[in-house]
């Protein structure tokens, strides 16, 4: 069954992430660079990609139902290790796309609303919700000690310099705590404001 897709132009030049913050209470997604890109909320389709070497093929097959529209955007987050769980591929029920200064609202029919209902309310007309003061976050360290982390980074740099390694992805966790809940919407707005040329994205994988 081919989902129904509707597209309308909206007259609102506020930042996409600010518009997302006014959206109905539902699962939210974002990928924004230099003020343009896509945000979405609600779930029209959640595609199970699983693990293993065929997960990207399963993702491609799952998106074929939406191939009739060039405005539908899927938000994805794939694990680096193909054997690890946690990869996500979602088509939001409602999306706002901004290209070359024009903003369009895309609504996709589906069966799983992800708590977002039809999600066709006017986020383009709603004000930003009031924000309660935030507590300063405290850093509580990582499960990887600083000296071990620095040695790992230095080893990777040496391997690249000697030509035994061309590319490496290093990551470690960082624990934070706060007396007030973390406000993801505000965090995204701050990140995009401070680093507009970087990709600011939100996918809960």
Annotate each predicted stretch with a short phrase.
Residues 1-205:
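Signature of the chorismate-utilizing enzyme
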């Amino acid at each position: 069954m081919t989902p129904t897709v509707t597209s309308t132009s909206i007259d609102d030049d506020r930042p996409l992430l600010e518009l997302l913050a006014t959206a109905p209470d539902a699962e939210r997604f974002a990928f924004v660079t230099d003020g343009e890109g896509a945000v979405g909320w609600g779930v029209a389709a959640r595609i199970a990609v699983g693990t293993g070497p065929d997960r990207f093929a399963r993702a491609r097959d799952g998106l074929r139902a939406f191939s009739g529209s060039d405005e539908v955007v899927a938000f994805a987050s794939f694990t680096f290790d193909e054997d690890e769980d946690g990869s996500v591929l979602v088509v939001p029920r409602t999306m706002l796309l901004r290209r070359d200064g024009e903003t369009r609202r895309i609504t996709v029919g589906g069966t799983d609303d992800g708590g977002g209902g039809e999600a066709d309310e006017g986020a383009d007309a709603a004000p930003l919700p009031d924000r309660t003061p935030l507590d300063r976050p405290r850093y509580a360290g990582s499960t990887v000690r600083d000296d071990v982390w620095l040695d790992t980074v230095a080893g990777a740099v040496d391997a690249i310099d000697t030509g035994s390694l061309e590319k490496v992805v290093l990551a470690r966790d960082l624990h934070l705590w706060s007396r007030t809940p973390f406000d993801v919407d505000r965090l995204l707005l701050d990140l995009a404001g401070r680093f507009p040329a970087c990709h600011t994205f939100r996918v809960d994988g």
